[in-house]
A protein has these predicted regions:
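A short, aliphatic-rich beta-strand micro-motif
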Residues: 127-136
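Intrinsically disordered, low-complexity terminal regulatory regions
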Residues: 1-86, 166, 176-195
Length: 195
C-alpha cells in the first residue's frame, strides 16, 4: 500500500518474523501476555514517564501469530486501549522495534515515511515515539519498552541512552523469570507432567 504525503511516498511493509511461534510460546509460558499487571514491570513504565517526561509509556510484547501487541505495563493510555491492554498490529510501532531488533526513533510520526500510515497515529494519538527492544534470555526480541508523546519532539541522546538501559533492565527481569520457571519445572515431581 502506498500513500502520497508531502511529496514523499509512504509505504507499509508487513512484519514477518520466522521465530513468531517460539516467541509466542515464551511469552505465554513466562506469563508475559494475558496476565495481570505486575510491579516488576510497572516500575519501568513509571521511570520512563517520569524521567523522559512523556504522557505514555509501555512495556509491549508483540505476537504476530495473534496479530496483536499486549501491554504488560502501561501508563497514560485511556479508553478501550487501557482496558484491553492490547492493540492489533495495525496500531503498533513496537512491532518494528521487535522486527528490526534495534531502537526506533520517531520525532514526528505523521511525517515519517516509515510509519505514517500506522493507525497508532490517528487512533492512539502517537506523534513522537522512542522504542527499544526487550529480549528473552536467548537474545530474541520480544517487544519493546517505549516512550510516546502526543506532540512532535526531538529525542535527546540522554533519552535514548536511558531507554536502552531501562530496556536492558526489563530484559533482565524476563531472564530472571525464565530462570525461575526452569528451576520450578526441574523440581516438579514426574506425576505433574502427566496430562
Amino acid at each position: 500500500m502506498y500513500i502520497e504525503l508531502s511529496n514523499m511516498t509512504c509505504s507499509v511493509r508487513p512484519v514477518q518474523d520466522h521465530y513468531s511461534k517460539t516467541i509466542d510460546n515464551v511469552l505465554t509460558t513466562l506469563q508475559l501476555v494475558d496476565a495481570p499487571t505486575e510491579e516488576a514491570f510497572d516500575k519501568f513504565t513509571r521511570l520512563v514517564a517520569q524521567f523522559i517526561k512523556v504522557p505514555v509509556a509501555l512495556v509491549s510484547f508483540v505476537e504476530e501469530e495473534k496479530d496483536r501487541q499486549f501491554f504488560k505495563s502501561q501508563i497514560g493510555l485511556t479508553g478501550k486501549w487501557a482496558k484491553s491492554r492490547q492493540t492489533p498490529l495495525s496500531h503498533s510501532l513496537c512491532q518494528f522495534v521487535k522486527r528490526d531488533n534495534r531502537p526506533l526513533i520517531i520525532e514526528d510520526a505523521p511525517q515519517d515515511v516509515r510509519v505514517c500510515t500506522n493507525l497508532a497515529i490517528t487512533d492512539l494519538g502517537v506523534r513522537a515515539y522512542l522504542g527499544v527492544p526487550v529480549h528473552d534470555p536467548d537474545g530474541n526480541a520480544l517487544g519493546a519498552l517505549c516512550a510516546i508523546d502526543t506532540q512532535a519532539r526531538t529525542w535527546e541522546k540522554s533519552d535514548v541512552d536511558g531507554m536502552v538501559d531501562l530496556a536492558a533492565c526489563v530484559s533482565d527481569q524476563i531472564s530472571l523469570r525464565a530462570a525461575l520457571h526452569r528451576q520450578l519445572v526441574s523440581h516438579r515431581p514426574p506425576s505433574q507432567y502427566a496430562p
